[in-house]
Amino acid sequence: MYDGMGCIVTLPRKYNEYLERQGIKCRIFSPIVPLLSTHQNNRDHRKIMVIDGATAFCGGINISDEYINEKMRFGHWKDTGFMLRGEAVAGFTAMFLEMWNVNDEHIEDCGEYIQASKKYSVSTDGFVIPFGDTPLDEVYVGKRAYINNLNNASEYTYIMTPYLVIDDEMYECMKYAAQRGVDVKIIMPHIPDKKYAFYLARTYYKELLKAGIEI
């Protein structure tokens, strides 16, 4: 599954049909249509790979030559990804299936895919609860997670992001954390791939630095 807008200039038209002919099931999430609708803003920017319910990969890495530095449009490309094993993989399976089933067609017996992770249980001292924001949500789960972490941080909060677009509530949480002694650091790229987002982020720098946040 790939996003209709995110891949509009990088993939050939009807690429999904080409994949289908190769035996690969493929769907386009929220394809672009020539109609004015707020649904055109519903996009899925997540990158999820789940293998047999045992292993999940997630992060910021797209399937693109830039991410393995075969193409150097903006210098050496650095991104973050992680691998997860165990029952928590079921969370990523559920997130994928939720988007996959947005269309009329549905996978029969989705529980089969969710339950597959139970046999790969891993014994550890901690726990992992995957979560995600989707265009289907009425609650901004990701934003709430950030705010909760900032409000509960006692020593430090380090954030690395390519795009820094924050509202007043998020700014106040960052500012308050820094003012009560939490070490708040934000890492941003110096060479942007999206110039408008780069210059928008810089409009926050002065106030963030004044609050004691390092960038």
Region locations from a protein language model:
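Charged, low-complexity intrinsically disordered terminal segments
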Residues: M1-I215
